[in-house]
Amino acid sequence: SSDVCSSDLKAILETYTKEYSAEYQAQALIDIAKKLNKRITDLKNINKIDIYTSHHTHYVIGTGSNDPQKMDPNASRETLDHSIMYIFAVALEDGNWHHVKSYTKARANRKSTIKIWKSIKTHEDKKWTKKYHDPDPKKKSFGAKVIITMKNGKKYKEELDRADAHPYGARPFKRENYINKFHILTDKVISKKEAKRFLKDVQNCKNLKNGQLDK
């Protein structure tokens, strides 16, 4: 409408898209894990993993929380969703993240995963805390630096300010990305025909008449 400022319309560009079904502070770390998955071929030889991040990430979803359930393979999905140690271990092994498969009991209890999981420790870094609270949307960061130390002493490092899907990330989410996410989340929940109909209608809302959306 005419009473809406252009700056208000642009505000949507400062929202934080979740590409992955996990706590938002985990988004950039999943992207980091995916990158490291392509670099490290011998995950079984990992000695330790150190994650340097913001106060919030360290104390809410990291080892700074001192919550033993975050290290428990039999913890609930709701708890694992807030365990960056678990999330990072699975994403590092799988090179991906799935809203269902990544949270199953069988997945959480995989021996190789538990080994990596237990090797992870988070640390608050004032640099990341400052970025986390930056009032400038273009500077505000939810990222981290990860250092993986192998048994032979070799180190792998990756750092990312914000998730790739973030409006200021490496590949900001576009319409096709949202549509793909919709298909992934509704797979086996609704038929492909219904998904196609729904997407067609919601992208044509301005031309729909009363009663057409639920036909």
Regions found by a protein language model. Give the residues of each.
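Terminal-appendage/accessory-domain detector
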Residues: 2-215
